[in-house]
Design a protein with these regions (language model features):
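Beta-rich strand-turn-strand
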Residues: 338, 367-389
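Structured core elements
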Residues: 5-7, 34, 63-66, 129, ...
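Nucleotide-state-sensitive switch-loop elements of NTP-binding domains
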Residues: 1-12, 16-195
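Charge-patterned, long linear interaction tracts outside catalytic cores
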Residues: 109, 113-115, 330-334, 343-346, ...
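Extended Gly/Ser/Thr-rich low-complexity repeat segments
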Residues: 339-347, 364-365
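Generic beta-strand structural signal
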Residues: 321, 344-345, 376
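A generic "binding-loop/recognition-motif" signal
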Residues: 39, 134-135, 336, 347, ...
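C-terminal lobe/tail of nucleotide-utilizing enzymes
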Residues: 194-337, 350, 355-357, 361, ...
Length: 390
């Protein structure tokens, strides 16, 4: 199943472009589902149809779904949530605060993304288009499987068998409720679900991310940051869509100045996102509502091309041997040396860029070797490792 995630700053037309992509894929005969994981759903508005929390048939080969995040959260987290709430309350935490603390930030959104795993397993659809939340929330969402795994492994470090033996002995001497047996089953299932979802989203052969932007400074800056952080987490960006470009016939009065501003920023888009392909769509003189209008938008963005095509392919990480030393290369566009921090763990390295930190498991050949040099060159971070293990 082909998976395409659309994200961008709020208000750039991301939902319209995602819906237009789905419409065109359906027209090409692909069984296509477009889903919205944004808490403020507008997918139904774009399609000009009522869309439910389960796949709703819109037309030939086309379905739409607005995910109910709370319901998804309950199905994946409810039993663990009950235990954690009890745990925090037992330590004197206010009941309401305990309820909030029992759900790590971003859990609602990641539960929504579990729908991708479900649809992949069911095999009903050829193409899945995901209308994600605005950029910042999407970045947190895509990083969350790593965060959730860390959170769960530290909250529940013991195995079910160990806890079954230890509980009768330990419980009388501690003030916290120890997790019951069934909790470990729920945690294990959730960890497996997170790993499965990450493997789907992180497979560049089938899943890519697309950035939608307008020709404005703040929007471009946010798109650049998104591109950087997506690269940090190994998500492949295969297309940038520049939306709502003022057409050439707009030459007079109020919009003439706006057209000049857009032209100035448009001149830099190619170099900013090179080598990612750029597609453009004009600002239409009518609202893009309903399947027919969205098909018109798809014409503008994709022309005769199949939107499910992967328009750009790249290797996010590469290991090679140079002069007897191993070098690991990571793609990190738009960052300066001062913004990057690299620390070494046991079998992994931690790369921090701005507010985002990623744990990168090292291939076996690099395990036990120390980083001797780090350099940034043409949008890539090069880490040199010692020739022999410590």
């Amino acid at each position: 199943m082909r998976v395409i995630l659309y994200t961008g700053k709020g208000g750039v037309g991301k939902t319209s472009v995602a819906a237009a992509t789905a419409v065109r894929c359906a027209e090409l005969g692909q069984r296509t589902l477009v889903i919205s994981t944004d808490a403020a759903h507008s997918l139904g508005d774009a399609l000009d149809r009522e869309v439910g929390e389960n796949p709703t048939e819109i037309g030939a080969n086309l379905w739409a779904q607005e995910v109910n995040a709370l319901r998804e959260l309950e199905s994946h987290w409810d039993r663990i949530h009950v235990y954690l709430s009890t745990l925090f309350s037992s330590q004197g935490v206010n009941d309401i605060v305990a309820e909030e603390m029992a759900s790590p930030p971003g859990m609602e959104e990641v539960a929504s993304l579990m729908q991708i795993r479900r649809h992949k397993e069911e095999g009903r659809f050829d193409t899945l288009i995901v209308d994600c939340a605005p950029t910042g929330e999407t970045l947190q969402l895509l990083a969350f499987p790593d965060v959730a795994r860390w959170y769960l492994q530290r909250l529940f470090p013991a195995s079910r068998a160990v806890m079954r033996v230890a509980r009768p002995v330990v419980q009388p001497f501690v003030s916290i409720p120890l997790p019951p047996d069934d909790i470990f089953g729920h945690v294990r299932k959730l960890l497996l679900d997170l790993e499965s979802m990450k493997s789907i989203l992180g497979d560049p052969r089938t899943c890519t991310v697309r950035l939608v932007l307008n020709l404005e400074k703040m929007v471009l800056k946010e798109a650049q940051r998104a591109f950087t952080y997506l690269s940090l987490y190994d998500y492949l960006t295969d297309l940038v869509v520049v939306n709502r470009v003022l057409p050439a016939e707009v030459q007079d009065g109020y919009f003439a100045a706006w057209r000049q501003i857009q032209q100035r920023y448009d001149a830099s888009v190619e170099s900013l996102f090179d080598p990612i392909p750029i597609r453009r769509s004009k600002l239409f003189d009518h609202e893009m509502l309903g399947v027919d209008r969205l098909s018109e938008l798809a014409d503008a963005v994709f022309g005769e091309d199949d939107p499910s095509t992967t328009f750009y392919r790249a290797v996010a990480q590469r290991v090679r041997k140079v002069n007897g030393q191993y070098e690991l290369t990571l793609q990190l566009p738009f960052v300066s040396r001062d913004e990057v921090d690299v620390t070494h763990g046991d079998g992994e390295i931690y790369v921090t860029v701005g507010p985002y930190k990623r744990e990168i498991s090292l291939p076996r050949i690099l395990t036990g070797r120390r980083v001797t040099r780090a350099r940034l060159d043409e949008g890539a971070l090069h880490l040199t490792f010692a020739g022999s293990a410590r």
